[in-house]
């Protein structure tokens, strides 16, 4: 649901009118598409207050670079699109920090979390040769990018807690 275009009270009202049993109301929020953080907070507050629901941002991300690594058009920045933060590691930190702060300020402690998403910002390439066989050199390069730019570093640090998985799936993607 886009908090910039939809009044969440309308959605929550329809769910309520149809006796839909749910615990948490979830929103997507991408700063370059979905309007202001004030609007997001107002929308989440309406659901939390009027329907006594916990709320989350279930999907967000922000770019660390605007370089096109894979030959596919980037979601942002696009012509005419204004970015509220710089395309940098610090811009990503600032974006996520502001979103987390906004959700934490939802009335009555009903803002319970933020989930970060969007591995498409990691510019990995195809790890296969034209004949379909695995190219070990390209795979190693992709793993290095995931280790640096994805959650690979977090998976590596978690090896002591889950040694059977941490080095196998590289963060799950």
Segments (PLM) and residue ranges:
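Noncatalytic carbohydrate-binding groove/subsite architecture in carbohydrate-active enzymes
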Residues: 1-76
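Aromatic-rich peripheral "rim/lid" segments of glycoside hydrolase catalytic domains that contact
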Residues: 42, 46-49, 65-98, 102-110, ...
């Amino acid at each position: 649901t886009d908090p910039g275009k939809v009044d969440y009270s309308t959605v929550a009202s329809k769910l309520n009118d149809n006796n839909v049993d749910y615990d948490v109301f979830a929103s997507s929020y991408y700063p370059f598409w979905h309007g202001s953080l004030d609007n997001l907070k107002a929308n989440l507050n309406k659901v939390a207050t009027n329907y006594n629901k916990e709320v989350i941002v279930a999907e967000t991300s922000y770019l660390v670079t605007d370089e096109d690594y894979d030959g596919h058009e980037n979601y942002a920045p696009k012509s005419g699109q204004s970015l509220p933060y710089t395309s940098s590691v610090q811009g990503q930190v600032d974006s996520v920090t502001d979103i987390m702060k906004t959700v934490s300020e939802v009335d009555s402690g009903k803002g319970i979390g933020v989930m970060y998403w969007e591995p498409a910002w990691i510019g990995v390439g195809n790890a296969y040769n034209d004949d379909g066989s695995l190219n070990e050199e390209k795979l190693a390069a992709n793993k290095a990018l995931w280790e640096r730019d994805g959650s690979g570093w977090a998976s590596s640090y978690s090896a002591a807690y889950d040694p059977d998985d941490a080095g196998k799936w590289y963060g799950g993607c």
